[in-house]
Amino acid sequence: MTLLGRIISFYSTCILSLCVATVLWFGWRPSFVQPVILAVILYLVPPLTFRLHRAFFPIKKSLSNLSERKYSPWWGAHQIQLIYTAVPQLEATLRIVPGLYSAWLRLWGSRIGRAVYWTPNVEITDRHALDIGARVVCGHKCKFLGHAIKPRGRQTALYTRTITIGSDVFIGAGSRIGPGAVIADGAFLPVLTDVHINQVVGSTSCSEPPVTF
C-alpha cells in the first residue's frame, strides 16, 4: 500500500473524531450551531471530499490490479464512504424524508431520477456509480455492488463500473445488482434475483454477462 493509501485509510476515523468533538462542544456550551455542524460533517463533508478526490484521482471504470504498488483511486473512494458501511443507520435516516436520499446520492455523482423509492435497508457500496431512471422501487435489503474483487494468483483484480437501471423498474427484496449491470425500462426482478457483472436484463428477458470477471 502506498503512503497516500495509508493516510486516507484514516479518513473515517477523522470524521468520527470531528463528530465526537462536536458532541462534547454541545455538552459544554449547547446551541443550535453544533447540530448543524454535526449534520454537515456527517452528510456533506464526505461527498464533497469524494468529489475533490475524484478530480485529482479519477476512478477507472474497468479492470485494474489492486496489488500494484501505486495508489488506487477506488481505494480512496472506498475509505471516504467507509463510515456509512460501518454505521448503516446514517444512510437509513436519510431515506425517511422522501427525495432526500436520492438528492444525497446525486451529490456523490450518481444520476437518480424522480420518485425513486428506497427501502431503509438498501445497501450501496459505491454511491457514485449509479444511473437510475424515474419511478424505480428498490425492495428490502437490495444490494447495489458497483465493484467486484477477485484474487488471481498473486494479483488482486478489481472491476468497477456504473450500474444502469431504467425507469419504472421493480427490484424485489434481497436482489443483488453487480457492477456494469444494465436493467431495462419496465423490468421486474423477483425476490432474491442476482444480476451478475455486466449482465443485461430486459423487460421480459435476461441475458448472460458479456464479460467474465
Language-model regions: role of each:
Residues 97-129, 133-134:
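Short linear elements at protein peripheries
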Residues 52, 119-121, 172:
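Generic structural signal for bulky hydrophobic/aromatic residues embedded
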Residues 1-108:
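Terminal amphipathic alpha-helical/low-complexity segments used for targeting or macromolecular assembly
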Residues 85-87, 117-118, 150-151:
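A short, structure-level motif marking secondary-structure boundaries and short turns
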Residues 138-213:
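Glycine-rich hexapeptide-repeat left-handed beta-helix
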Residues 17-21, 116-118, 171:
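Hydrophobic, membrane-inserted alpha-helices
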Residues 60-66, 109, 113, 139, ...:
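Glycine-centered flexibility motif
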